[in-house]
Structures are given as C-alpha cells and as structure tokens.
Amino acid sequence: MAETARTAPAVDFVGGAVGYRFRSQAGRSHALLKATGLSPTRSLHVIDATAGLGRDAFLLASMGATVTLIERVPEVHALLAEALEAARAESDELAAIIGRMTLLHGDARVLLPTLQADVITIDPMHPPRTKTALVKQEMRLLRDLVGADPDVGELLAAALSADCGRVVLKWPLRAAAPPAARKPSHQIAGKTVRYDVYVRPRTT
C-alpha cells in the first residue's frame, strides 16, 4: 500500500533537526540569540508571537530563556502541545527546557497588550519566494495549513506598543520591510534571513 502523503508538518523537539541542534549545541552562535540579546549570563523572558513549529522558541528555552509561545491556528497549537508533552516525557534534561516554555492559543495582537516580557519575537509567514528552490517540506506544509500572514504590520505595531524592551522581526534577507514598519534600531543578517531589531524603552 502506498504511503499516504502528510498534510500537516511534523513538530518534534526530540529528533530531527531540532534534536540534532540541541544535542550538538550547534545553535549557540545562532543569529537569533544575538538579536534577542540572550546570553549565558543574561536570562530573558521572550514572547514568541508566531510560534509556528516552535523551533525558535525551543532554541531560546534551551539556552536558558523563559518563553511564552502564542499560536493562533488551532491545528498548529495542537501539534505544538503534543510535541511539548512528548519532549517532556523523553528525559529530565528536555523536561527542564519544556518547563521554561508556556504555550498559549490565541491572536497575538489581542494577547500582547495583556503580557509583559523582555523581548517579543515575530517570525510570520514570509512572502513566497519566486527565484529560489522550493521551501523545505515542513515549511511548505505549515504554509498550506496556516496560509499567509497579511496582518504582519498590525502584529508588529502591537508588539511595539507592548510592555517589552525589544522586538525582533525575522524577515527574508532582501525583502522589503512589512507595510508601515518603521526603521529598526539595527539589523542582524544571516544567509537567507535578517533580524530587524527594535530596541525601545519599557512602558513601566
């Protein structure tokens, strides 16, 4: 019998690329850590406003951050919840990391005004690529499930109005900024994406 094609992305914090990066500690120099300001001597509370597959949130939590994940798509939220529990049961080390992760279901534009954090990260569905190879299967399946994020400008505005000291937007390296986005404080560039960093005074 032919194998049925998957219609949902795999969310896995134990095996695959996430597990390898964790076991090999390959993420210690990741640009996201620089963008958020996280370091071994500086623990932060980070809100991941677009949790998706949870990979960035897990990386941050594995490096000591306390992370609140917000996911508005019910199917993706359910996949994340299941993966978090599977990782929690895998080992004490993973359980300690998962213990620093809190998953919320809802629209970040609504939830952010009710929350406080040191950093808010935003990694929306990026504009479709037109001159590159097909995106990896997991991201393609995620895009098929959640669709586009036309409201990224509204989400960025909500984050910049929230009680936090820094907002980090992950965006394609050479893509134009989202509509109405103001100039970031600085940028950290990777090979295919950049992190637009907005450093701002706390409201309290």
Curated annotation (Swiss-Prot):
Disulfide bonds listed in the record: none
Residues that hold S-adenosyl-L-methionine according to the record: 55-56, 71-72, 123
Keywords for the protein's UniProt record, in alphabetical order: Cytoplasm, Methyltransferase, rRNA processing, S-adenosyl-L-methionine, Transferase
Reaction equations catalysed: guanosine(1516) in 16S rRNA + S-adenosyl-L-methionine = N(2)-methylguanosine(1516) in 16S rRNA + S-adenosyl-L-homocysteine + H(+)
Main location class: cytoplasm
GO MF annotations, alphabetized: rRNA (guanine-N2-)-methyltransferase activity
SUPFAM superfamilies: S-adenosyl-L-methionine-dependent methyltransferases (SSF53335)
GO CC terms: cytoplasm
UniProt keyword Cytoplasm present: yes
InterPro entries: 16SrRNA_methylTrfase_J, SAM-dependent_MTases_sf
EC assignment: 2.1.1.242
Domain of life: Bacteria
Cytoplasm as UniProt keyword: yes
Signal peptide: none
Pfam families: SAM_MT
Cell location: Cytoplasm
Family assignment from sequence similarity: Belongs to the methyltransferase superfamily. RsmJ family.
Family matches, as PANTHER family: RIBOSOMAL RNA SMALL SUBUNIT METHYLTRANSFERASE J
Cited function: Specifically methylates the guanosine in position 1516 of 16S rRNA.
UniProt name for this protein: Ribosomal RNA small subunit methyltransferase J
Organism: Rhodopseudomonas palustris (strain ATCC BAA-98 / CGA009)
